[in-house]
Amino acid sequence: MAERSSNGYKEVPVRQSEESTIAEEEKDTLLEARSYSRRDRKRSRSKAVWFLIALLLLSNIGLLGGLIHYFRKTHHKEKDVPWLPPKTVGRGFVNINNDTALPDQPGLDQSLPHQRAMISVFHQLHCIYMTREGYYAAREGNLDQVNAAHLMHCWDYLRQAIMCHADTTLEWIPAPPNDKGSTGWGVEHTCGDFDAIARWAEDNRLKTTYGIH
């Protein structure tokens, strides 16, 4: 039976070449560990960045949907705003009896005892309505619902109508710093009796349709 030694642990001498090899192995192990650690951190950061991007995209999609809903809701609510043209029965189209000679105008046939016409103010209000509808359709992205040729006609027609009536009411400029112009609100104008015109148009209506479009 082999005898047991009572000697304690002793440091085993290592040759320089072996010490160098061990040091290199330890160094490589540490570098590899650091490399894995950096990769893990990069992966974690990358996942966090992608998560934030996805969260922002979802938030923006939700915001966009909310804005579209708001604009559409606002559009429908604003259909009853006070400036919306009144819906007169007959839409401003009237029958005219040629009892007396009328000035020659485009579309007028003097040989007929009855003539059809549209009262200009209703044409103007119709154009305002079309401009408004085109604006909301474009804002909601429904460009196929915008009749560009009709709008161009309406803008030119309204321009000439405004210049024809040429309202010369004075709109006073406020004191500084609000002296850039005038809102025109509250200023008195000399106006025609639109209610009386609308009643006459309904009494002599050509059509029984209701609306302004």
From Swiss-Prot:
Report the EC code(s) recorded for this entry: 1.-.-.-
**HXXHC 1: where is this motif?**
123-127
Is the keyword Oxidoreductase in the record? yes
Q: Which cysteines are joined by disulfide bonds?
A: none
Q: Which GO terms describe its molecular function?
A: oxidoreductase activity
UniProt topology in membrane: Single-pass membrane protein
What pathway is this protein a component of? Mycotoxin biosynthesis
Residue ranges annotated as motif HXXHC 2: 150-154
* Keywords attached to this entry: Glycoprotein, Membrane, Oxidoreductase, Transmembrane, Transmembrane helix
Known glycosylation sites: 98
TM ranges? 48-68
One Gene Ontology term of the biological-process aspect is: mycotoxin biosynthetic process
Q: Where in the cell is it found?
A: Membrane
- Which residue ranges are recorded for the region named Disordered? 1-26
Q: Does the keyword Magnesium apply?
A: no
Superkingdom, taxonomy of origin: Eukaryota
| GO CC terms of this entry | membrane
Q: What happens when the gene is disrupted?
A: Decreases the production of ustiloxin B.
Instruction: Write the signal peptide boundaries.
Output: none
Domain notes from UniProt: The 2 HXXHC motifs are conserved in ustYa family proteins and might form active sites.
Q: Which family does it belong to?
A: Belongs to the ustYa family.
The protein's job, in short, is: Oxidase; part of the gene cluster that mediates the biosynthesis of the secondary metabolite ustiloxin B, an antimitotic tetrapeptide. First, ustA is processed by the subtilisin-like endoprotease Kex2 that is outside the ustiloxin B gene cluster, at the C-terminal side of Arg-Lys, after transfer to Golgi apparatus through the endoplasmic reticulum (ER). Cleavage by KEX2 generates 16 peptides YAIG-I to YAIG-XVI.
The record's section on PANTHER family has: TAT PATHWAY SIGNAL SEQUENCE, YALI0B05434P
What protein name applies here? Oxidase ustYa
What is the scientific name of the source organism? Aspergillus flavus (strain ATCC 200026 / FGSC A1120 / IAM 13836 / NRRL 3357 / JCM 12722 / SRRC 167)
